[in-house]
């Protein structure tokens, strides 16, 4: 895959005078929750409403998402607010259901990016799609894996591509939930300067007080947008141990 100015076309088509903003809850929990958040966001700079329908968890027994019923809530968000919609997909069935419910943007999560098998399955299911497809960096700082995921999607004739930087896992003590390791997305940006690059400060920070700092750094580095988790009331989200997140 070579850099191509056409890679930016889908982003340019938004005709924005500010960075692209994708926002919404980490997880879809109820229809009322989704609609409340979407209605708060619709008058802002947010262009795309995000919500996790299926949630990959480290251990069984944790909340793994509401499942396909949440796709109907995304449809309602789109119909009533005019916002485009986005969700994470991790297999071919997720892709099929998301497309059936007219989700506009599909992203591949960091835990999926680490597996060429998973990325290829998703790429095959998306072959030739006109949906916007975003791929997060792998959880470990392996730029080759990220390149490989991008190339697999591009080889499946997916034209509306972008990447999301969400930081990297580390055993070292850090103020960040996932270390940004800015040199890695910068290297990707140097290789593909026209591939839209979005920062996910929520996953990098893991706490609200760092969001502005990380968001500003990404924009100073010429990132094209932000993906931010947004909640109306943190005390009511399904993961009370992570109420410091936004």
Describe each model-derived feature in a short phrase:
Residues 64-86, 125-132, 184-194, 242:
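Alpha-helix-loop-beta-strand connector modules within alpha/beta enzyme cores
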Residues 31-40, 90-96, 210-215:
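Short, acidic/polar
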Residues 20-34, 60-62, 85-88, 110, ...:
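Active-site mouth loops of central-metabolism enzymes
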Residues 1-22:
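N-terminal amphipathic alpha-helix/helix-capping segment at the start of soluble metabolic enzymes
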Residues 51, 55-107, 116-118:
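N-terminal active-site wall of soluble small-molecule enzyme domains
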Residues 235-246:
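Single conserved hydrophobic/aromatic residue that forms the stacking wall/gate
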Residues 20-24, 47-51, 85-87, 106-108, ...:
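Hydrophobic faces of well-ordered beta-strands that scaffold small-molecule active sites
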